[in-house]
Amino acid sequence: MASSRILITSALPYANGPLHFGHITGAYLPADVYARFQRLLGKEVLYICGSDEYGIAITLNAELAGMGYQEYVDMYHKLHKDTLKKLGISVDFFSRTTNPHHPAIVQDFYRNLQDKGLMENLVTDQLYSEEEEKFLADRYVVGTCPKCGFDRARGDECQQCGADYEARDLKDPRSKLTGKALSLRETEHAYFHLERMKEELLTFVEGIYLRPHMRNFVIDYIKNLRPRAVTRDLSWGVPVPGLENKVFYVWFDAPIGYISGTMDWAASIGDPDAWKKFWLDDKVTYTQFVGKDNTSFHSVIFPAMEMGQSLPYKKVDALVTSEFLLLEGFQFSKSEGNIIDMDAFLETYSLDKLRYVLAAIAPETSDSEFAFQEFKTRCNSDLVGKFGNFVNRVVAFAAKNGCTELSHPQLEQQDLEFIAEAQKLAKEAADHYQQYSLRKACSTIMELAALGNGYFNDQAPWKLAKEDLWNRVRSILFCACYCQKLLALISYPIMPETAWTIWGMIAPGSLDLRSQDPERLQSIWTEAFFDYSEESFSLKEPELLFTVVE
């Protein structure tokens, strides 16, 4: 039996820059669509997200910007929260890894892993700056790549040849901040023995949902596990118990932010223990949405961390990954100028246009591309030509002919067949949402709009009106409005504003919009909603849903 309680998380956005369309399509729009759909089904949904606020990239860029670390992450936390709100991402609580609950639970995770014999302190050689009097983590280091000889290679990866390595392997390493040469010194770090958990992890991933093309990647990753450092020589982060001047590596503390973020939510509603009903109850269904570059952390490392705890933390049931979204064939990059100003875009084009196109091109199993020409084509062909045209022509015809109150139609066989086909497509859309396919859901939405348009054309009520066959005209309009009611229903997870507008125009008697939150429609997707026998419609003046993109 499916769980009535649904926990949803999407990858915590790193507080080191603005969000772009690639981020939105990869983790936040898919999670929002799924959350909205599950609420329609009447599930108790909790969608948690928040800023990932520790790590080297943050400290380095804050220093380069002349800002304090907290000041820097505060800036991006607010920006991310505002961006998600503008995009209609219905996150229930947007927390941050600097929340007051986070340090204690991260340290508790670490101690439990120590108690299980899965942590070990090892002494290794690390790069040290005599001038700055501290060890430098990889992003603070530049030098000559040991593979290709590129002389401005980063401390963890060469931008020229793509090689990855330890910072100490660089030739002529120097500080990124001062340019001074670095030396090697011994330092102690804690290592997580992931390789000791291979069999347990292989069994675990057999039982969770992964996109088929990702499963082999995850299995290979598990088979090649090795000890992994969980600590760094930084001042910004969660302090490590028993190791002076060390903080936890961001990959270790960040996923625990899903739990501490839920604690933060529980505190905000005045029920500090409310987090437990989502994280300590195995009957909950837990779905995570991440980009493909986060797959290993969420499919293997975070579950391994949870397995080593004394509390039975809920592990992921479905890990929904996305490939990369490219911009005109290239990766989104602020430094390269390959970016779209999201605020400016939304000032020009409606939110639902953007949400629909991003959903229709979602990089679910392979990289996809955002190109303005395709955006224009999909808006004008799909949203204006098919979807908007169907809704507008029906409501406008009804208003023009005074047929605004519709109920108890006299249905013919062709009407019943049309209604049955509309119901079938609506249920197909539900399957696509359950299977995390935004692309297929978009296709089905357009199929239903095309079905409605075809029915209205075939029945040609304007001809019947000339013959004064008004009962038949009203029956056709009733069926068309019923189709629009379902069209709004299956569109709502992707285009919530548009769905709300359609329902407002046709005013189904079965739907009391006054009692609903537009952002969190609850318990609408029911058998009663699909029943047409007692339905009625009270049509209002038509509103233009979409305008042509020039």
UniProtKB/Swiss-Prot annotation:
One of the protein's GO biological processes: methionyl-tRNA aminoacylation
Signal peptide: none
Lineage top rank: taxon: Bacteria
Pfam families: Anticodon_3, tRNA-synt_1g
Primary location: cytoplasm
EC main group: ligase
Family: Belongs to the class-I aminoacyl-tRNA synthetase family. MetG type 1 subfamily.
Motif ('HIGH' region): 13-23
Protein name per its UniProtKB record: Methionine--tRNA ligase
NCBIfam families hit by this protein: metG
CDD domains (alphabetical): Anticodon_Ia_Met, MetRS_core
Residue stretches in coiled coil: none
Cofactor note text: Binds 1 zinc ion per subunit.
PANTHER family for the chain: METHIONINE--TRNA LIGASE (PTHR45765), METHIONINE--TRNA LIGASE, CYTOPLASMIC (PTHR45765:SF1)
Function: Is required not only for elongation of protein synthesis but also for the initiation of all mRNA translation through initiator tRNA(fMet) aminoacylation.
